[in-house]
Amino acid sequence: MTLRVAINGFGRIGRNVVRALYESGRRAEISVVAINELADAAGMAHLLKYDTSHGRFAWDVRQEGEQLWIGNDVIRLLHERDINALPWKALDVDVVLDCTGVYGSRADGIAHLEAGARKVLFSHPGGNDLDATVVYGVNEEELRAEHRIVSNASCTTNCIIPIIKLMDDAFGIESGTVTTIHSAMHDQQVIDAYHPDLRRTRAASQSIIPVDTRLAAGITRIFPKFHDRFEAIAVRVPTINVTAIDLSVTVQKPVKAYEVNLLLQKAAQGAFHGIVDYTELPLVSTDFNHDPHSAIVDGTQTRVSGAHLIKTLVWCDNEWGFANRMLDTTLAMAAIGFR
């Protein structure tokens, strides 16, 4: 039976989820029945079809009133600010993918359920009171039918968690630091303008800008044993897509760089195929645009110091990879049933 999905928020992730659904050939498994977005219908259709990062959508897209047509599929468009007023019950929605980047609390999830959805998946980190936080490929098997309010974590958490798991299982991680080198985002300014964060008052295209990150908290949410053993910082750089993560960990077992690369390469070809990829080609960030993997290890940048300090560089398309994991987690939530 085809899963009936609604999307709340049709920004970068919401639109990429729809594109990924059609490009991945999973329309027999998932049907988008409604999209809620405060923007007007014409703008929604236009930005789905034309995308600066990912190019022109291969499918025919047209908008008729409050309906969005993709090929022969019709999707109802909504413009409702109040979650409680959304018609999820009338639309028989199985799972809501909340891609607003605004909502993420348990109360927000309950509001979607009370509106008639059977389950909710947030496209960003939520509070500790959510039923589960999933990094697909690592812990989706922990999902239970009673888990109705779930977070898909963040794009950077999805990128780094598989690598941390692999290194910890093989070498035993003592502690680590992470630096996220992230493309500019919508909460930055085109030209200097006011923002509560004074660094984000500055033009995104002209500076490398340090920003706050909760990635360390995201790591410990998946692996509680690393509480107080990981720290993270983040900078935004003047590109529009693709992120690099510099991961440094101290490990218990002595190791050489080639052993680290061999571990990650084998994982990419085996247990983590489709989630982790590995390359030693001389590539740059744009080469990973539209890559569906959560993490792409750059083996040319692996270093080991003193046999116990490992440094690796991991790439991800912070939009496309994450959108594909949203679909994976949605199907995993459905596979365990509804209660």
Swiss-Prot record:
GO MF annotation, one: erythrose-4-phosphate dehydrogenase activity
Cellular location(s): Cytoplasm
Annotated binding of NAD(+), by residue: R12, I13, R81, N318
Keywords attached to this entry: Cytoplasm, NAD, Oxidoreductase, Pyridoxine biosynthesis
Matches recorded under InterPro entries: E4P_DH_bac, GlycerAld/Erythrose_P_DH, GlycerAld_3-P_DH_AS, GlycerAld_3-P_DH_cat, GlycerAld_3-P_DH_NAD(P)-bd, NAD(P)-bd_dom_sf
Family note: Belongs to the glyceraldehyde-3-phosphate dehydrogenase family. Epd subfamily.
Annotated pathway: Cofactor biosynthesis; pyridoxine 5'-phosphate biosynthesis; pyridoxine 5'-phosphate from D-erythrose 4-phosphate: step 1/5
Site feature Activates thiol group during catalysis, where: H182
Catalytic activity, reaction form: D-erythrose 4-phosphate + NAD(+) + H2O = 4-phospho-D-erythronate + NADH + 2 H(+)
Protein's UniProt name: D-erythrose-4-phosphate dehydrogenase
Oligomeric form and interacting partners: Homotetramer.
Signal peptide as annotated in the record: none
Class of this enzyme: oxidoreductase
GO biological process, one term: pyridoxine biosynthetic process
Active site: C155 (nucleophile)
Species this protein is from: Cronobacter sakazakii (strain ATCC BAA-894)
UniProt function note: Catalyzes the NAD-dependent conversion of D-erythrose 4-phosphate to 4-phosphoerythronate.
Record EC number: 1.2.1.72
Binding site for substrate: S154, C155, T156, R200, T213, R214, R236
Record GO cellular component, one term: cytoplasm
